[in-house]
């Protein structure tokens, strides 16, 4: 059924970077990927704000050139979560230029109190930071480059190793 629907659809003449779902083979840049976990597409439709989506596409295209595709997918996931949060809270923004420190702090409180793990949260924050800083550099939104402070990223919980004597093990 999918093949039939694709067959009857008119061919999309836009460049791959203009589309909301990128076919990585059509980007004409080398992709650093894991051969076991094949990634063929990147889906930007999960970013619900149109202007935000277009800005993020440019940043992600830049990142694809220098980072492994798994890292880029993780960045896209962090932006998707941020976009979902904006919709959930009814925050109306259409550009990364509208993201300010107050909004970021509300989001940080949300992700740190929703019950998910600390490791995932710190990785999400790092990836969100990378994308927003890239958008800031590409579009001249200088406030995005200094939006995050070091204490925004929760420290990873370090495991405590303990040694046991033979007597304790028996």
Labelled PLM ranges:
Residues 160-170:
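Short, intrinsically disordered, charge-balanced linker/junction segments flanking boundaries
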């Amino acid at each position: 059924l999918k093949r039939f629907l694709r067959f009857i659809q008119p061919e999309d003449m836009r460049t791959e970077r203009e589309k909301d779902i990128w076919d990585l083979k059509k980007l004409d840049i080398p992709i650093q990927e894991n051969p076991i976990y094949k990634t063929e597409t990147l889906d930007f439709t999960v970013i619900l704000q149109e202007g935000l989506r277009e800005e993020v596409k440019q940043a992600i295209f830049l990142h694809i050139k220098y980072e492994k595709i798994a890292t880029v997918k993780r960045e896209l996931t962090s932006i998707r979560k941020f976009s979902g949060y904006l919709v959930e809270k009814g925050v109306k923004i259409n550009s990364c230029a509208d993201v300010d420190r107050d909004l970021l702090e509300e989001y940080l409180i949300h992700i740190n109190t929703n019950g998910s793990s600390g490791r995932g949260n710190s990785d999400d924050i790092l990836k969100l930071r990378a994308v927003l800083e890239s958008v800031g550099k590409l579009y001249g939104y200088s406030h995005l480059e200094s939006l995050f402070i070091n204490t925004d990223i929760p420290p990873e919980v370090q495991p405590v190793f303990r040694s046991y004597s033979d007597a304790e093990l028996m």
